[in-house]
Amino acid sequence: MANIDIKREQSYKERLKKEVLRRTQSLSCRIFLFGSRASGQFRRSSDFDLGISKISKEDFFRVKNLLDGIEDELNIPHSVDIINFDSAEDEFVHQVTLQGVEVWKQR
């Protein structure tokens, strides 16, 4: 992680988490960070991978719309990818689980 401002990267994550939770507070679902940002093995160019589960397809698309462009609104220089884990391949879910996740919302 050479030449990465860890405090700045942490502030991006915290601002993103706070806003994601604010925008989804009325929905019942599970939201978690996964991938390199969750494991701490990120690079300066790494995106934020958010997984959502325990949610209907309709509500998932509602969440995607609520979060569309959030990185620009929060002035975060990284993209945010949102994955519906209820419809993801089992092997992908298994691999993510092995790598570890950072749970942001339980329900």
Locations of regions flagged by a protein language model:
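Catalytic core of pol beta-like nucleotidyltransferases
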Residues: 1-30, 38-44, 53-107
